[in-house]
Each structure stands twice: as structure tokens, then as C-alpha cells.
């Protein structure tokens, strides 16, 4: 027994009539312009078909003829076809211009809709993104304040002559304060010393401190 379940939507209707009338309705590629009044022909040919109603046929035809594929096919020099694919006269210029305008309008609507959808998507993504907490900038650690009270200078005294010996650890006045040093050579009043950084120099014995 043949399945008489009705078609669910216009897409299924278009697929069904393309299967029944393949020389007229095309599912892929550029469509052929349809004969004027083809709805009546369809309704008559499918009057006993319980799968599709006249209302469904009308809605399916409207969707088919408003598709970009169909509007692209409505161009100068093209011929309309009937259900069996037979030519039914060349397109009139008025119909070609109408199809061209409809195509441009349809594309403009799609472009505007896509633009609006993209804008909405950006706004939604922005709304979902957690707002950055306005934390104050991190303050860099300040160097320890220099004590107002300067440390008392270490009290030193001049060396006795018997303390000026090679290898003895002493302090030497370098102008900016005393620096530790070691005596490495003695030549009368001139004493060669080695600072803690390894630098050697000759100073007067009177500049050495204990």
C-alpha cells in the first residue's frame, strides 16, 4: 500500500515535486523559469495525491521561486518551461527586471541580518565576559628610608710603629671613610696595602688606622 503521509514542510514539497517533475523543477544548480500559471497545472496533476495539499503546493512554489537559484535563472533569453520541461515562451523584460530587483533586495536583507546577528553575538560575548576588577595599581616597594640619625662613625686611632707590619689588618682613610685593608709591603713611610676588593695601592703610614 502506498504511503500517503503528508509532507511536513515546503522543503519536502519542493523535493517531492522535483522528483515527480524533474524536467521542470531543479534542486541543484541554476533553476529554470516556470510557466505562468504552473500552480494550476500542478494542482490538476496532483489532485489525487494525498501527500500534498494545494496550500502546501502554493507555499512550496513561493519558496522555490523566491530562492536565489531561481532568481539567477530568470535572465534575458531564458525560456519558461512547463511541468514536462517543454518551452513555454521567452521571458519578458519586465519579469527579468523584477527578478533582478528581488534578488538584490533578498541579498541585502541577508547581509543586514548577518550583520545584526554578528553585532548581537559580539554584545552577548561582551556581556558574558567578566568585568575586570578595578584594582589599584600595585605600588612598588619603597626603599627603606634612610635613618635620620646617621650612624656614629667607628672610632679609630693612628697605628703605632710596631703595629705597621706585613699581614696586619688595618683601616685606611679613603676620604669617604675608612676601608679595611691588609698590609702587604712596607717601604719606610710608604706602605703597600691590599683592599678587600683585591686592589693594591701605596699610602702613607700616617693614613693607616687601627
Swiss-Prot record:
The superkingdom of the source organism is: Bacteria
Gene Ontology terms, cellular component aspect? Answer: cytosol
Ranges where the record places region Disordered: 98-155
Give a yes or no for keyword Cytoplasm in this entry. yes
* Entry annotated with the keyword Isomerase: no
Set out the biological process GO terms recorded for this chain's protein: post-transcriptional regulation of gene expression
- Which UniProt keywords are listed? Chaperone, Cytoplasm, RNA-binding
Q: Where is the composition biased (Basic and acidic residues)?
A: 98-127
Extract the SUPFAM superfamilies matched here.
Answer: FinO-like
Compartment annotation = Cytoplasm
* NCBIfam families per the UniProt record, alphabetical: PRK04950.1
State the protein's purpose. Answer: RNA chaperone with significant RNA binding, RNA strand exchange and RNA duplexing activities.
Q: Which HAMAP family match?
A: ProQ
Q: What name goes with this protein?
A: RNA chaperone ProQ
Biological source species: Aliivibrio salmonicida (strain LFI1238) (Vibrio salmonicida (strain LFI1238))
Q: What is the lineage of its organism?
A: Bacteria, Pseudomonadati, Pseudomonadota, Gammaproteobacteria, Vibrionales
Amino acid at each position: 500500500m502506498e504511503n500517503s503521509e503528508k509532507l511536513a514542510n515546503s522543503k519536502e514539497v519542493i523535493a517531492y515535486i522535483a522528483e515527480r517533475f524533474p524536467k521542470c523543477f531543479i534542486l541543484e544548480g541554476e533553476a529554470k523559469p516556470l510557466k505562468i500559471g504552473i500552480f494550476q497545472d500542478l494542482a490538476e496533476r496532483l489532485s489525487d495525491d494525498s501527500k500534498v495539499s494545494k496550500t502546501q503546493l502554493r507555499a512550496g512554489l513561493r519558496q522555490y521561486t523566491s530562492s536565489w537559484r531561481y532568481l539567477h535563472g530568470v535572465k534575458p533569453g531564458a525560456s519558461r518551461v512547463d511541468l514536462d520541461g517543454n518551452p513555454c515562451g521567452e521571458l519578458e523584460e519586465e519579469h527579468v527586471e523584477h527578478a533582478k530587483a528581488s534578488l538584490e533586495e533578498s541579498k541585502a536583507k541577508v547581509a543586514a541580518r548577518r550583520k545584526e546577528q554578528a553585532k548581537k553575538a559580539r554584545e552577548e560575548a561582551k556581556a558574558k565576559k567578566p568585568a575586570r576588577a578595578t584594582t589599584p595599581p600595585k605600588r612598588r616597594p619603597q626603599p627603606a628610608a634612610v635613618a635620620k640619625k646617621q650612624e656614629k662613625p667607628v672610632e679609630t686611632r693612628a697605628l703605632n710603629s710596631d703595629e705597621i707590619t706585613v699581614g696586619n689588618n688595618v683601616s685606611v682613610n679613603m676620604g669617604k671613610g675608612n676601608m679595611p685593608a691588609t698590609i702587604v709591603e712596607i717601604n719606610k713611610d710608604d706602605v703597600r696595602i691590599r683592599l678587600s676588593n683585591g686592589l693594591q695601592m701605596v699610602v702613607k703610614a700616617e693614613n693607616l688606622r687601627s
